């Protein structure tokens, strides 16, 4: 079997690809490596700023839609699997679908249906709304952009032609279930345990190492700024009993190396489900 994974989200598809390969499946992963995260990928696809960067990116996606053919499965990491407007995404979606087998979707990150569920009060609270009150993120163009008519039409089209989908978090599952029904399976977040080998701690210091991993651009969304403040207060109160290891915007391998020294890992603030806590 040949599987084509297009796009990645915080190493999710890279971990999935690693396990599929261990099971003898031929996998090709196209992504930008998560930018500074530098996650595994087979084909590097990234958009640089400016008009020239846009033209080069459009050319690269077009060439990939010509060359990546004959796969049994094409799985997109999100409806926005490339950094393009909805009408261009639909064009390339149709090309990949025509030249390959089944079309599948990973529900990871925001899309029209998830943001609509947040806006419609499906969740008691979300990064966009708490009850009827908009949060800081809910007052941004990012929030309203997901609800634009062209985004809605494109997402409805994509969901309508899918052969199946997997949800990475329960909230994504809740938002998409009314539309996809039995085509949707909750799979959770793939984790490549080969990258997380057991390691002995050096406990000679006797202090507890508190680890906080951050993406600076997602600090507001994930609440890591709040966590940092709380953890720092704890360290200031008991400097002889604990220390804070904070990392931000580093490669995934550096992240793993730093995390191995941690006794307690706090990657993000609790959200609607335990999956994000």
Each predicted region: which residue ranges?
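Acidic donor-binding loop of glycosyltransferase active sites
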Residues: 260-273
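Conserved donor-binding/catalytic core segment of Leloir-type glycosyltransferases
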Residues: 185-222, 228
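A conserved mid-protein helix/loop that constitutes part of the nucleotide-sugar donor-binding site
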Residues: 11-15, 218-233
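Membrane-proximal helix-turn-helix segments that form the acceptor-binding/catalytic region
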Residues: 62, 68, 91-98, 128-164
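Acceptor-binding helix/loop patch of EC 2.4 sugar-transfer enzymes
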Residues: 39-42, 105-149
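N-terminal subdomain of nucleotide-sugar transferases
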Residues: 1-43, 98-101
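A short, active-site helix/loop in glycosyltransferases that binds the activated sugar's phosphate group
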Residues: 114-115, 142-184, 229, 233
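Short N-terminal targeting/anchoring amphipathic segment
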Residues: 2-6, 65-88, 102-106, 266-267
């Amino acid at each position: 079997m040949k599987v084509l994974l297009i796009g990645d989200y915080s190493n999710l598809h890279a971990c999935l690809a690693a396990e599929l390969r261990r099971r003898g499946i031929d996998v090709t992963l196209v992504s930008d490596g998560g930018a500074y995260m530098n996650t595994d990928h087979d084909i590097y696809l990234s958009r640089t700023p400016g008009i020239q960067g846009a033209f080069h990116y459009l050319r690269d996606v077009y060439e990939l839609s010509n060359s990546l053919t004959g796969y049994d499965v094409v799985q997109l990491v999100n409806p926005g699997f490339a950094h393009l407007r909805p009408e261009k995404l639909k064009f390339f979606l149709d090309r990949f679908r025509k030249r390959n087998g089944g079309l599948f979707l990973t529900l990871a990150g925001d899309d029209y249906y998830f943001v609509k569920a947040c806006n419609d009060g499906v969740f008691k609270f979300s990064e966009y709304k708490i009850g009827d009150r908009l949060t800081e993120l809910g007052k941004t163009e990012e929030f309203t952009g997901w609800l634009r008519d062209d985004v809605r039409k494109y997402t409805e089209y994509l969901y309508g032609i899918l052969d199946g989908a997997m949800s990475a978090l329960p909230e994504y599952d809740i938002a998409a279930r009314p539309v996809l029904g039995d085509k949707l399976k909750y799979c959770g977040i793939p984790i490549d345990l080969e990258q997380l080998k057991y390691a002995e701690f050096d406990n000679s210091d006797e202090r507890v190492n508190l680890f906080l991993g951050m993406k600076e651009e997602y600090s507001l969304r994930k609440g890591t700024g709040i966590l940092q403040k709380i953890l720092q207060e704890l360290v200031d109160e008991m400097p002889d009993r604990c220390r804070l290891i904070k990392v931000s915007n580093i490669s995934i391998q550096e992240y793993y190396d730093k995390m191995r020294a941690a006794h307690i890992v706090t990657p993000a603030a609790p959200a609607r489900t335990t999956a994000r806590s």
